[in-house]
Amino acid sequence: MVKISMKKKCSAYEAGQVSGPLCLDLCKEKSIHFDKCLSTNVDKIVYDGEWKGRKVILKRTLDWFKLFEEVHHFLDYDNLLSSSQHYISSYVEALFGNCTQCDKLKLRLVKHFDDNNDGKVTATEVRSFVTLLHLQEPMMLIALNESKHTVDFYGYCGGLYVVEKVPYTASQVFGATWELKDLSLLPDFLEQLEEIGINMVGTIVDVVFAIPYVCHVLNDALMLAKYYIFTLTSQTYIPNEQEKFEFVYSLMDTTLGISSYPYGMLQSCDLHLGNYGFTNISLLKMIDFDHTYPMIYLGELLMQKQCTSNNDCWVGNVNQCYSWCNDGTGTCNSVVWKHDVTNICQVHIPIIFRGLTIFASENSSCQRKAIFPLVKLCQSWPVITSVQQLEETVLKLKEQLKSIQNSCSEL
């Protein structure tokens, strides 16, 4: 399937219908290779692959083709350069407003028009690049490409774009949980019998652990047994308590770093641990920007929504990017209730500390108990609307976590 798709793309490239800095590598030099498909999403397909011997992630989306036709109708081909520059300027302002570095961003984007660096800008080059900017993730990656907190954007050919591959996602390491039902010992044809047996054992365990004294005595032994069974049946690395805290601190720094970029605050509307990854030097990076928006643009998206109740006022994940309905206007308010750092505190910190621990101890038990008051504290935070407010919130959260870390380590 991918061979047919790339053959069509290269035919379009050779006919001068699509362009991009990686088209030569894809179609002539054959230095881009596709490996395993990582996504079954019909609208957006993601592949493992290589580019000039470097391991990369390749992405393509069907929306690009529809947008490619739409861009054709609003470009002024008689005044190609000036009309496209005006479009870029308007588009950047719509996304980021009048940010301090927006003029530099506009100039940087315009330089991408000449994708083969031959000193000439063609209609195909402009049309291909402008279409790419209409896709949320490529636009955000290109804008933030100099940030150490985002995966590197290597280039594109038409609707195919190539980004840095990180060895591990955070969900693989810090989102790992294990239950008795995950254990698989019998062959596949005995799966039903195995499931019945596991359910029976689970019921017995629940009854036994309902007795307070027995629960206290056996809890540590069970946690230790789960650890050894898990290590025998899974390749997932299990982080220790120190690594969990360090990861949360890195998560805070990454969130603050991305929103402190000179283009203004950002908000992820599909925030989960699978959207973060580690490089070979353990640098945490955000790896998915499909639903990450500048706060100004997100506010506009919300205000454009007609509403009859608060349930109508959300973008992306309904539990993350939501506001409230203005009864007077029948439209949604532009202010998002919860910033990423609040979502991380309320949802993801409990997941991180709920995961498997190498040894069940008073230390880990103390940490898990201390997390619940922290989550309640996060729920009381005011709406974050400025970078300064975000910095103060991140500092406050780090202080609370360090207090938990220090007090529990003394046990």
Predicted region positions:
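Helical subdomain adjoining the active site within ATP-dependent kinase catalytic cores
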Residues: M1, S5-K8, K36, P294, ...
